[in-house]
Amino acid sequence: MKLVEKLKAKYASFQTTEGVTIACLGDSVTQGCFECYIDGNGNGNTIFDQSKAYHAYLREMLATLYPAVPINIINAGLSGGRALQGAERLERDVLRHSPDLVIVCFGLNDCGGGLAGLDGYAESLRRIFDGILKTDAECILLTPNLMNTRVDRSLAEPKIKEIAEQIMKRQNDGILDAYVERAKEVAAAYGIPICDCYAKWKKLADAGVDTTLLLANRINHPTPEMNKLFAASLLEMILD
């Protein structure tokens, strides 16, 4: 990717060239959400920790490889966010920062629209890609993690358990599968590289791994350790 050339140039002459800026546009996983709980008002809430989001680990890896290069990360993740919202806030949250690379990751919330929502999802992704590609920024589509395939016994709170049951159906009925495939089709039509971590999670499931245990909230937020899989996969693509 062109980003590598910028990293090399800055590393070779860090006093005369700019650092690099990577923007990550997505949902709660991008924002840095982990465990969920019911607060004192009876509302669902989540624990936030940006330092353990995938882009934090990516920045750490790049800083290890290019210690003289400032790596600026724009966290444009939004809990509960969908691609439509991402398209609407693209300029405000991403493009005005003039990023060198934009990583786009949606689908976990979008799939709540069922198969009937696929066309709208695809159109929102097109709006996002159109906006990015009008600039000098490169773009990567990052496919999401699997959601829970069962309701874990640790989910004792009725409201959270009910959410887990709904999400499980979207995963096991192939709804999220369909959204991931549609996203890949749209990205491929634009010639946008695809970092297919969803396929890697699928391989883990096929290998007998209980992927529900790899989710911090046992629903849809990966553990910090699994966010490192996103980071390592993105690093491999960036360096390719």
Per-region residue spans from a language model:
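Alpha-helical cap/lid subdomain in secreted, periplasmic
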Residues: V4-K6, Y11-T16, A56-N72, Q85-D240
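Short glycine-rich His-centered loop
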Residues: K10-F48
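Conserved long hydrophobic alpha-helices within structured protein cores
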Residues: V20-G32, D49-H55, I132, D136-P144
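Glycine-rich beta-strand-to-loop/alpha-helix junction loops that act as flexible
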Residues: L25-S28, S79, F106-L108
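Short, electropositive, low-hydrophobicity segments enriched in small/polar residues
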Residues: T30-C36, G81-Q85, C111
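Short catalytic helix/loop segments, enriched in acidic residues and glycine
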Residues: G40-L62
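Short beta->alpha junction loops
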Residues: I74-R82
